[in-house]
């Protein structure tokens, strides 16, 4: 049974279980226990699995380690401490690992000193880190004399499990601590780790599992994820310690200008930097988060340029920077040498960065959990308040952040989504298992299903992965895909095959795809530049985009290259900054829909401003801006909300545009829009352009192919969204690129073989060839199934798109169809994505201003 911890132990009760030197050390250093420690330490001591959800700076890492360290000290005191690994600590960040080692070695040294003063000598408790940075010399030392506490990453653990000598050393593990669970649960690195833990448990017998997480929801699911399942299908028992709100959080939403529509870009930018300067001046250390890496660079650059006093005091920190640069920034921050750091996502995790007084978010963080994680970096100690300010730059952002801040204050978190049954990760582990010994098929199936991500795995899918590994799909051999295991279904057994198999496993395990820069060439082979793979995924033939200040039309792709044709003066269909944007969570999107209804009902209330200011704690500027925005929409068109879905048709000289106001987040909108565009292009026999945002999507057709209201209503009666989307994905760049990732993880295309690294271009060509072969001959091939699952469930959000469609079908949401001369105010942001190349934010604002002026004239609001 999984239950919430009810009992808060007293300091005395905890001191009672601690060894004398540990007790004295703790008393001297901290004096008293923090909430997570009061709930967790004794339970871990008793051998319970525990998940701790608490803010940064609440001592959760020590809560996890204290009981384990205490046990090691007790053993040491009795002379029973052996040379073996007792504690395994796994974290997704290599940087975090070095932090943890430092933060463990110090207390261990101090405890030995205390013991020495008390008159007895304790043996040294050794701590070691094993990651891809660890030298083979260090690794050999660990085999000969294993550390008592081993610190590692999910990737290195998977390799260690198959290291013949070292895996023997893992048999003695008693405690496993998984840190930053929130950063693992939603992706395949987490899947990878959970399978490793089940394999470890099979090797070492039962151990205590301790999960540490920042703010995350629903905790029951996350606990099942960390603890795993019993063979009868019930979750393993354990405790949830939820002290995620032990720390006070203050969140303010601010607009840097009074008028978000008419302020020109230069003034807006001036106001933003002026406000940032004020905030940095008022606080000792400020951490600024932008939503993109390029944004982080830009903000840091402008702050230094505009305010020379900050030249040495401001740095940027994001994942594109080299490791050394990042470490240097973290060190400076810890020593208090910086006034401000600008980051994209790289500082969200618990790297120890010393004390931060204020966190500023520029633009919406798109999810309540992310907002709380980022703002939780402020006030690093428990009694300090986490102060956060969100600065908004447009009206949609203002509405979204108003709801987001309200949810954060009222602890309404977004649900996380844990990938289910990723077959590519399963391939790696079944191969890893075959390297250990000969397995009974049913035993292996049972083991896999103990891991949360696979607790619903069908036997069919499991067998299809084994059959693929055993080379039972004809036609793959000549594509150089060879069998890696033998499989005897009659006997119900499988095992390793081939000398090279172990090397293949070592060289190719892991879940993070190699990031590719895609080269862009003209058809006559002239090199133009590179784009990110994420950007290339979005391209469809005929798409027009800007690179190095010129416009090009996408023609085709070969391997790692894409070919284009210069198209001077053509209007781009895809903005360059699109690939990095964070998607809005579905739960928050629904709350914004409800907020729209609430504001709609306030529009004629003379006290509207006051009501909004009180309930949502926004200032007068913000309340006025929101009400103004909604009044314009209501006058010109209809306000879509949780019961009304607005679809607008806007005709231009040559094109017909359809705006679907489906406020369900970009991931769900991507699923819907691609399926709809596919159906329309089949029916009308023409190309359909798509633009997608969190608040809806737009379809663009030639004017003579326009859709009737009936056509649009029929789209929403769509029977099978999955099947339609699958057809829509056929031949897309997205499918080709994602298939390479899945084929890498599923060892169909090896990144490294015989000590050589295969070029990404080569891999991509192989992927395209294999994809064609499999689609034609084996539509049920496990890795083909997985690439569709990954795109539809992890990249897009098909489940919530289906849910939304069902609400429309059941009539819970009514469709309102309008023909408008211009897009309504709520559609402005979509119009811009599909309108002009808004490489520059200035052009965006200019365009919105022009649209706004025309509409105000139409509803008679211009003097």
Swiss-Prot record:
InterPro entries: ATP-dep_Helicase, DEAD/DEAH_assoc, DEAD/DEAH_box_helicase_dom, Helicase_ATP-bd, Helicase_C-like, Lhr-like_ATP-dep_RNA_helic_prd, Lhr_WH_dom, P-loop_NTPase. ATP binds at residues 30, 37, 60-61, 179-180, 377, 380. Residues 513-863 are annotated as: Domain 4. Its EC number is 3.6.4.-, 5.6.2.-. A motif (DEAH box) lies at residues 179-182. The record marks 512 as: Wedges between bases of the loading strand. Changing residue 215 to A: Loss of ATPase activity. The keyword Flavoprotein does not apply. Changing residue 512 to A: No change in unwinding or annealing activities. Residues 275-424 form the Helicase C-terminal domain. Residues 418-512 are annotated as: WH domain. It catalyses: ATP + H2O = ADP + phosphate + H(+). Unwinding of dsRNA duplexes is inhibited by AMP-PMP and ATP-gamma-S. PROSITE patterns: HELICASE_ATP_BIND_1, HELICASE_CTER. The keyword Chaperone does not apply. Residues 41-234 form the Helicase ATP-binding domain. Monomer. A DNA:RNA helicase with a significant strand annealing activity, probably involved in DNA repair and RNA transactions. In vitro has a slow helicase activity with a preference for 3'-overhang duplexes; displaces RNA from 3'-overhang DNA:RNA or RNA:RNA duplexes. 3'-tailed double-stranded (ds)DNA is not unwound. The slow helicase activity on RNA duplexes is ATP-independent. Has strand annealing properties in the absence of ATP; forms 3'-overhang DNA:RNA, 3'-overhang dsRNA and 3'-overhang dsDNA duplexes but not 5'-overhang duplexes. Composed of 2 helicase domains, a winged-helix (WH) domain and Lhr-specific domain 4. Deletion of domain 4 leads to decreased ATPase activity, slightly decreased DNA-binding and loss of DNA unwinding or annealing activites; the isolated domain binds ssDNA and RNA less well than intact protein. This is ATP-dependent helicase Lhr-Core protein 2. The lineage of its organism: Archaea, Methanobacteriati, Methanobacteriota, Thermococci, Thermococcales.
């Amino acid at each position: 049974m999984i239950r919430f911890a009810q009992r808060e132990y007293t300091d005395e009760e905890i001191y009672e279980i601690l060894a004398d030197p540990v007790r004295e050390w703790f008393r001297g250093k901290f004096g008293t226990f923090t909430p997570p420690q009061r709930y967790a330490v004794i339970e871990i001591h008793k051998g319970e699995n525990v998940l701790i959800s608490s803010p940064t700076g609440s001592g959760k890492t020590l809560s996890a380690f204290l009981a384990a360290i205490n046990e090691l000290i007790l053993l040491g005191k009795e002379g029973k401490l052996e040379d073996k690994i007792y504690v395994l600590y796994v974290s997704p960040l290599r940087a975090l690992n070095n932090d943890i080692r430092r933060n463990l070695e110090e207390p261990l040294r101090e405890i030995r000193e205390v013991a020495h003063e008390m008159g007895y000598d304790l043996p040294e408790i050794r701590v070691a880190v094993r990651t891809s940075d660890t030298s083979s010399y260090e690794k050999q030392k660990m085999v000969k004399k294993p550390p008592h506490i081993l610190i590692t990453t999910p990737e290195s653990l998977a390799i260690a499990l198959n290291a013949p000598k070292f895996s023997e050393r893992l048999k003695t593990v008693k405690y496993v601590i998984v840190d930053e669970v929130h950063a693992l649960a939603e992706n395949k690195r987490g899947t990878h780790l959970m399978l490793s833990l089940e394999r470890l448990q099979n090797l070492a017998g039962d151990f205590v599992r301790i999960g540490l997480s920042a703010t995350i929801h629903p905790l029951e699911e996350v606990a099942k994820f960390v603890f795993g399942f019993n063979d009868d299908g019930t979750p393993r028992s354990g405790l949830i310690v939820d002290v995620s709100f032990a720390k006070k959080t203050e969140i303010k939403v601010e607009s840097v200008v009074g008028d978000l529509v008419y302020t020109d870009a230069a003034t807006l930018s001036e106001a933003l930097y002026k406000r940032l300067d004020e905030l940095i001046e008022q606080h000792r250390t400020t951490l600024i988060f932008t939503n993109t890496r390029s944004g982080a660079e830009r903000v840091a650059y402008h702050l230094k340029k505009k305010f020379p006093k900050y030249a040495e005091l401001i740095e940027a920190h994001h994942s594109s920077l080299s490791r050394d640069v990042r470490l240097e920034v973290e060190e400076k921050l810890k020593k208090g040498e910086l006034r401000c750091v600008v980051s994209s996502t790289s500082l969200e995790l618990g790297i120890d960065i010393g004390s931060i007084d204020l966190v500023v978010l520029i633009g919406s963080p798109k999810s309540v959990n992310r907002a709380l994680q980022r703002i939780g970096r402020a006030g690093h100690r428990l009694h300090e308040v986490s102060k956060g300010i969100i600065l908004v730059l447009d009206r949609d952002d203002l509405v979204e952040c108003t709801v987001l801040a309200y949810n954060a204050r009222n602890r309404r978190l977004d649900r996380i989504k844990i990938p289910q049954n990723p077959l590519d990760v399963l391939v790696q582990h079944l191969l890893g298992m075959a390297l250990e010994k000969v397995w009974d098929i049913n035993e292996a199936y049972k083991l896999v299903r103990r891991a949360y991500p696979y607790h619903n795995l069908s036997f069919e899918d499991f067998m299809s992965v084994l059959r693929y590994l055993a080379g039972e799909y004809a036609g793959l051999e000549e594509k150089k895909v060879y069998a890696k295991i033998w499989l005897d279904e009659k006997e119900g057994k499988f095992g390793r095959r081939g000398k090279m198999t172990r090397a293949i496993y070592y060289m190719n395990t892991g879940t993070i795809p190699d990031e590719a820069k895609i080269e862009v060439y003209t058809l006559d082979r002239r090199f133009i530049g590179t784009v990110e793979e994420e950007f290339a995924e979005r391209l469809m033939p005929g798409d027009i985009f800007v690179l190095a200040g010129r416009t090009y039309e996408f023609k085709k792709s070969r391997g790692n290259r894409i070919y284009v044709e210069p198209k001077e003066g053509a209007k781009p269909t895809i903005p360059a900054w699109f690939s990095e944007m964070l998607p809005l969570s579905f739960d928050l999107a629904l709350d914004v829909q409800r907020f729209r209804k609430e504001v709609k009902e306030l529009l004629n209330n003379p006290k509207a401003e006051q009501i909004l200011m009180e309930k949502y704690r926004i200032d007068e500027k913000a309340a006025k801006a929101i009400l103004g925005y909604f009044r314009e929409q209501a006058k010109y068109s209809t306000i879509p909300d949780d019961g009304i879905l607005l679809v607008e048709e806007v005709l231009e000289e040559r094109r017909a545009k359809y705006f679907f106001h489906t406020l369900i987040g970009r991931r769900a909108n991507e699923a819907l829009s691609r399926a709809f565009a596919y159906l329309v292009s089949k029916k009308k026999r023409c190309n359909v352009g798509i633009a997608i945002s969190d608040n809806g999507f737009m379809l663009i057709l030639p004017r003579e192919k326009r859709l009737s209201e009936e056509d649009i209503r029929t789209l929403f009666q769509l029977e099978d969204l999955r099947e339609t989307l699958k057809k829509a994905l056929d031949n897309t760049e997205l499918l080709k690129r994602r298939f390479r990732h899945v084929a890498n993880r599923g060892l169909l295309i090896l990144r490294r073989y015989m000590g050589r690294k295969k070029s990404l271009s080569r891999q991509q060509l192989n992927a395209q060839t294999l994809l064609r072969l499999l689609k034609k001959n084996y539509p049920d091939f496990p890795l083909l199934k997985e690439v569709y699952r990954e795109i539809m469930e992890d990249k897009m959000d098909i489940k919530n798109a289906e849910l939304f469609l069902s609400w429309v079908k059941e009539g819970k949401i009514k469709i309102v169809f309008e023909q408008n001369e211009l897009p309504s105010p709520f559609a402005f942001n979509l119009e811009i994505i599909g309108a002009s190349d808004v490489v520059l934010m200035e052009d965006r604002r200019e365009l919105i201003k022009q649209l706004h002026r025309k509409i105000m004239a139409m509803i008679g609001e211009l003097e």
